[in-house]
Amino acid sequence: MAIGIGVNTWVWESPFTAASVGLIAKAQAMGFDAVTIPVEEPAAIDARAVAGALRDTGLRVHVTGAFGPTRDLTHDESRFREESLAYLADTLVLCEAWGARLLVGPCYSAVGKRRHVPPEQREREWERAVRGLRRAGAMAADHGVTLAVEPLNRFETDLVNTAAQLVRLLRDVAHPAVKAHLDTFHMNIEEKDVAAAVELAGTELVYVDASESDRGTPGSGQVDWAGLARGLRAIGYGGDCVIESFTPACRTIAAAAAIWRPLAPSQDALAQDGLRFLRRLLA
């Protein structure tokens, strides 16, 4: 099956606002098949303008969530778990309005939550994530959307770091609208064998982030890209592979992703060179 190549607008800007809509046409002009729109604050986005730009370009669209301290399905306080679900509900409305079939990201917990905790607490938090994702999956299904759940590296979460942990989580959730999302940046840190990790996710895998070992241009660093391609071919993956990177010019997201310097001659160069590399890799 043909694999499409997409780009996340985080490459250029954060947050995505009414002023960011032109990035959709930019992605099309560069030759991408799909665009991923981060919804950091749903109210900041001109939903109609986005829908119009998507209609005009014909690009496939995905949506990624942003999960800060108050958007945490594992939190001890139920009000924060409910806040996370309320945010997902608002974001799912946008997904449906735009025709996005996937809402992707680490939606089980707050990014940056990493601690040594007793096994009993870890298990409680795991069960909260399972219950929360079941509820979120039901909400997503009502909008014709699938949640694609992403493991993060050990420096960004203490709950789900590997494909094996993700597969266990999906089995526990056991909801048809909750599937797998893998990111090469995190895999490069946590997986011993990229191809094997992809194969373990198997047909549950519906979304892939292409991000270099330093978050720079795909193909310029240490990620096992050949292993990724082998794994995707082995499972017959037919979804999109989406370039994800960040710019140090956007201080909030740069601080969250620890981006302290430029990672390419320009963000446009990162996108264009990454697109060429991925076209060759996944042809």
Specify the residue positions occupied by each region the protein language model found.
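Short, well-ordered coil/turn segments that N-cap beta-strands
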Residues: 1-5, 31-34, 55-62, 97-102, ...
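Catalytic domains of carbohydrate-active enzymes, especially glycoside hydrolases
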Residues: 21-41, 91, 97-99
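Active-site-proximal loop/turn and secondary-structure-junction residues that shape catalytic pockets
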Residues: 11-13, 39-41, 67-69, 109-111, ...
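N-terminal small/glycine-rich loop or linker at the start of catalytic domains
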Residues: 1-10, 63-75, 107-117
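Active-site acidic/histidine proton-transfer and metal-coordination neighborhood
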Residues: 55-56, 79-179, 261, 265-269
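A short acidic, helix-capping loop that chelates divalent metal ions and anchors anionic groups
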Residues: 70-75, 111-116, 156, 189, ...
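Histidine-acidic metal/acid-base catalytic patches
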Residues: 1-9, 13, 17-28, 160-182, ...
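Active-site-adjacent beta->alpha loops and helix N-cap segments on the catalytic face
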Residues: 43-53
